[in-house]
Amino acid sequence: MAAGGAVAAAPECRLLPYALHKWSSFSSTYLPENILVDKPNDQSSRWSSESNYPPQYLILKLERPAIVQNITFGKYEKTHVCNLKKFKVFGGMNEENMTELLSSGLKNDYNKETFTLKHKIDEQMFPCRFIKIVPLLSWGPSFNFSIWYVELSGIDDPDIVQPCLNWYSKYREQEAIRLCLKHFRQHNYTEAFESLQKKTKIALEHPMLTDMHDKLVLKGDFDACEELIEKAVNDGLFNQYISQQEYKPRWSQIIPKSTKGDGEDNRPGMRGGHQMVIDVQTETVYLFGGWDGTQDLADFWAYSVKENQWTCISRDTEKENGPSARSCHKMCIDIQRRQIYTLGRYLDSSVRNSKSLKSDFYRYDIDTNTWMLLSEDTAADGGPKLVFDHQMCMDSEKHMIYTFGGRILTCNGSVDDSRASEPQFSGLFAFNCQCQTWKLLREDSCNAGPEDIQSRIGHCMLFHSKNRCLYVFGGQRSKTYLNDFFSYDVDSDHVDIISDGTKKDSGMVPMTGFTQRATIDPELNEIHVLSGLSKDKEKREENVRNSFWIYDIVRNSWSCVYKNDQAAKENLSKSLQEEEPCPRFAHQLVYDELHKVHYLFGGNPGKSCSPKMRLDDFWSLKLCRPSKDYLLRHCKYLIRKHRFEEKAQMDPLSALKYLQNDLYITVDHSDPEETKEFQLLASALFKSGSDFTALGFSDVDHTYAQRTQLFDTLVNFFPDSMTPPKGNLVDLITL
């Protein structure tokens, strides 16, 4: 705080002047200095590398040391094959020793892009004098790299930079000393360790870990070490580690309670193309409609998670002033007002006429159990025409509904009739629930402008209630499978292309052409995608598999939680079917973000031998990370395993008893891998000391080296701020 209680003003971020210092190459007149001027309409105003063979780079030298916070890339006025699809930025006080500040890519458009560079270590700003830009991939395969214009911004006020420079020098010195301390302790150079620590007064780690090293490595007090780990777990010190672990999916088939003898009438039957929504407050799943293989359905169900029971709200909603039987419609729920909306449907070409092609729009009130027709024809009210395979999202806070895409049904011939006129797709609409008015936000567009969006069917669309954006990806347009991914800010009416789908990241993103069901967790900033079966018969039975993906919104990265790469066989193993749902399409997936559970029902298994077959299985899916209890048990297992191995060398009989009792209880005997590892431990009873492998610590005894290795393993579970440095001194030696 400044004098008088006023908050000190944030240091001013301004443009940082720089000069071109070094470069890998350049071609013809495309000189490195060209990046100093911004001329988006001049095609020659750029640096272009002579080749795309690595390493290609530009090194910029700032006029004086500065905290470099942002880098801005200017571009040519049109898309260009030489634009950087992937690049990295490094920075440092000298050109020989640089830290990675950014790894990213440019969109292939004409808009300037600004990126935030890493400029803090442990919340402390650090300065740079040199910035190195390393192109990795251009938008056109095998084209040279081009950079049109670069702007650096940050803080170069000496009054701010100098203290940061002093801190950075001190930080590097401190880390070097900590690496030495770690090395000395690993090799049991006690005098050197104590002398250096006494002289520098630098701590290698948190006192708790020093205590653990003393108890475990020096004294071999394994019981005290276990107590220390238990305290750490209970104090939440392993939480950071848990949050960084990958999810593991846990499917469970739900067998609902049966109230009637025959068990048929008290749960929804087989179907595909149905719709589900979930009320997370009451833990109730609502299911409406679908196609059972021969006809559309109009039944309406509620499943109570707490009661594990389905209730039939209505056998035929049309008889209760609700929607007629339908499939390929969409539903969304307003949890605040406890209302469900439904729009759209598929109609066979044989029953299409001007009356049946009207797009009706209904609202169901949960508390009063009543349906209300909001519109006989949304197109006449300024909304979408009759569509199917569209997407619909609810914004409860602003009481708005967004609907995007879907195929518009027309009278002229079948949807699959190639002689029919080109298929029409619906744009992006907003419905104001309060005023009951529609607004067209984006028409279907084939243009590639920054604010244009291409309509499609079978895509995923999700609303992030916290950052107030719609996320759209995947889908199909005529015969083309789309792989783009964009967000739409509902408040600013702005489209942001996350991925244009041209990246050849096969295996790193969910594959196109497969039915995808997606959910969102606004609290965790995650999008979940279950990828199932393709609707295309040709693509269907090559390699049927389910895969589950998670997109981290903040990190802008996909990760595959699992794939079951079983080949498609008519006789899928029974055991597999009991463990997880078989691949399918036309199913429904909903997510309870409060209790972190997914629910899946029904669908079409795509069996060519029985095309009318539909499913009525019901599953829950939990994404699990290691729990605190699991980590505590695992750490105890590691400690006791080591203790057993030490005992086995000294007193095999005592070791055997320890193995059968103390070590036995730390093993999960339902886990085949853990059980196998446990069974193999008995072989240690028959090993001689010479059988044990050296750990590279030739100057310390085997016991000390083994305990040090166990200590290093246990340290990995603690937060980085508490642990010794990750690197090793010997790794700095270059050959």
Curated annotation (Swiss-Prot):
Keyword Chloroplast: no
Domain CTLH: 206-258
Segments passing through the bilayer: none
Reported impact of residue 184 to E: Strongly reduced head to tail dimerization and strongly reduced GABA receptor internalization. Causes loss of location in the cytosol and accumulation in the nucleus
Subcellular location: Cytoplasm; Cell projection, Ruffle; Cytoplasm, Cell cortex; Synapse
Stretches forming Kelch repeats: 284-330, 339-391, 400-458, 469-515, 526-578, 597-651
Impact after mutating residue 143 to A: Strongly reduced head to tail dimerization
Signal peptide: none
Keywords, sorted A to Z: Acetylation, Cell projection, Cytoplasm, Kelch repeat, Repeat, Synapse
GO cellular component: cell cortex; cytoplasm; cytosol; GABA-ergic synapse; nucleoplasm; postsynaptic endosome membrane; postsynaptic specialization membrane of symmetric synapse; ruffle
Gene3D superfamilies: Galactose-binding domain-like, Kelch-type beta propeller
Coiled-coil region: none
Sequence ranges assigned to domain LisH in this UniProt record: 172-204
Outcome following mutation: residue 144 to R: Loss of head to tail dimerization. Causes loss of location in the cytosol and accumulation in the nucleus. No effect on GABA receptor internalization
GO function terms (MF aspect): identical protein binding; protein homodimerization activity
Database matches in PROSITE patterns: CTLH, LISH
Any one GO BP annotation for this protein: regulation of receptor internalization
Predominant cellular place of this UniProt entry's protein: cytoplasm
Free-text comment about domains: The LisH mediates head to tail dimerization.
Oligomeric form and interacting partners: Homodimer; may form higher oligomers. Identified in the CTLH complex that contains GID4, RANBP9 and/or RANBP10, MKLN1, MAEA, RMND5A (or alternatively its paralog RMND5B), GID8, ARMC8, WDR26 and YPEL5. Within this complex, MAEA, RMND5A (or alternatively its paralog RMND5B), GID8, WDR26, and RANBP9 and/or RANBP10 form the catalytic core, while GID4, MKLN1, ARMC8 and YPEL5 have ancillary roles. Interacts with RANBP9. Part of a complex consisting of RANBP9, MKLN1 and GID8. Interacts with GABRA1. Interacts with the C-terminal tail of PTGER3.
Protein name as catalogued: Muskelin
